[in-house]
Structure formats: C-alpha cells, structure tokens
C-alpha cells in the first residue's frame, strides 16, 4: 500500500514579498515565511525599522532583503518590483483603518483608506502577477483582508467597504490567473494585538464589545496568523484559490 504523503509546508528556493513588513501582521508574516525557507523582501516606508527586521531574520538563519517604499506611489513601486521580481509569494499586509461612524466619515477618510487597502493592493498584486506570468512561474498571493470583509460593525463602514472590495477583487483575479498557475486567497483575521489594533483596544467599551464577539474570549496575536500564512503560501494549500481563510475566534460563526 502506498500511503499518502503530507504536502510540504516548506518554501525553500522561493522568493516572497511582504508589504507592511515593519510591524504587526506583516512582520509576523515575514518571519514565518523566512522560517519556512523563503527569501523574503520586506517592504514598508520605514527603512531603519526594516533594516532591524532584516538583520534579526538573518541572525536567526533566514534570508531577507529590504525595499523601503510607499505602496501608494505606484510608478515607483512598479519600477522596484520589475527590478527585483519575480516573487513566487506575496503577502499584502499594509493597511489603514479609520474607525468613524458612517454619518461622520469624510471624503478624505474614505480616499485614504481605499488608497492603501484597495488601490495599492490592486496594482501591487497585479505587478507581482505580471512578473510571474512573464517568467512562466506559478505563485501564491495572499491578501490580508479581515473578518470585516465578511460582516459589518459600528464605525467600520469605510474599513469594511475596503475589505469587502478586496474579497471581490481576489476572487476575480483568481479566475483570471488560475490558468497561469497563480493562486490568490485572502486571510481574514479578527482584531489582532498590533500597534494598529492597540488603538482600538485602548477604548474600554470597544474592547468589551470585541471580546463579546470573539467566542474564544481573547483578541488574536500575530502568532495566530503565522501558521496560516505559511499554509496559504505553500504547496499544502495547492488546491485553494479565490477563497478565504478566516481566523476570528468564532466571530463570524453566528
């Protein structure tokens, strides 16, 4: 009898690009991918912080490079990716949240959130896919979405709109790029303890509401997402594309 073998979670020999890699979810994703054997390019605006992350990953035996850039500056990003690609793995983790009631949200709030969470994600993802197609390589692209890409919440209208749109964008791209061997999925976390998330958790009323919705009774940690990132990036998820992986402690189960 030939027993089935577990597909590999290793990423040796693959190049990965992680946006928002200087902190939070992006930092965790970069570390996880490096631990799995990928050569990781860390993309964010803060070059000094990126250099610290790179040096620590290298000190622990991983492979890492940095790309200091603003993902909303599309011509510069396009030029940089064309020079450094192709990347077999992408984690779009850079994001922006402005929690304002829908009746009070300004056009500037809307445009700022959409510029990062949707516009930059669209064009950066497309550029990575173009590089893979030109090189004739398969790949796995991961958009960090949110549970708010599947539900709504008070003071979340603009943010939820950006994440619902990201979900639809991911599905459409999956249909177009599957013939090229390019998979694309979303990872949808609940509230995670990050520098961005701490701003929300400092409000006692909001924190109480959040904990009432998370059935496991705690907010998420960056470490809760590191395994799922490696799973989606690796051959272990080879039959997944155009769908989502929700890590929300049971929030969306009801």
What is each PLM-predicted segment?
Residues 15, 22-24:
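Conserved glycine-rich cofactor-binding loop
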Residues 130, 175-179, 238:
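Alpha-helical segment proximal to the catalytic Tyr-Lys
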């Amino acid at each position: 009898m030939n027993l089935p073998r577990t597909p590999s979670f290793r990423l040796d020999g693959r190049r990965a690009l992680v946006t928002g890699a200087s902190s939070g979810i992006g930092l965790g994703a970069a570390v996880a991918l490096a631990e799995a054997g990928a050569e990781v390019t860390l993309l964010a605006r803060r070059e000094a912080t990126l250099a610290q992350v790179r040096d620590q990953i290298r000190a622990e035996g991983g492979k890492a490079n940095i790309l200091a850039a603003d993902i909303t500056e599309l011509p510069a990003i396009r030029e940089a990716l064309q020079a450094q690609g192709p990347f077999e793995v992408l984690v779009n983790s850079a994001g922006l949240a402005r929690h304002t009631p829908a009746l009070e949200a300004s056009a500037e709030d809307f445009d700022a959130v959409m510029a990062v969470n949707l516009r930059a994600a669209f064009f950066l993802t497309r550029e990575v896919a173009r590089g893979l197609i030109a090189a004739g390589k398969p790949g796995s692209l991961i958009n960090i979405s949110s549970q708010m890409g599947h539900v709504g919440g008070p003071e979340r209208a603009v943010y939820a709109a950006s994440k619902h749109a990201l979900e639809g964008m991911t599905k459409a791209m999956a249909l177009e790029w599957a013939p090229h061997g390019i998979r694309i999925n979303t990872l949808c976390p609940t509230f995670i303890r990050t520098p961005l998330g701490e701003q929300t958790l400092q409000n006692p009323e909001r924190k109480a509401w959040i904990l009432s919705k998370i059935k496991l009774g705690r907010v998420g940690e960056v470490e809760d997402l590191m395994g799922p990132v490696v799973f989606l990036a690796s051959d272990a998820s080879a039959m997944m594309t155009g769908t989502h992986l929700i890590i929300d402690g049971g929030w969306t189960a009801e």
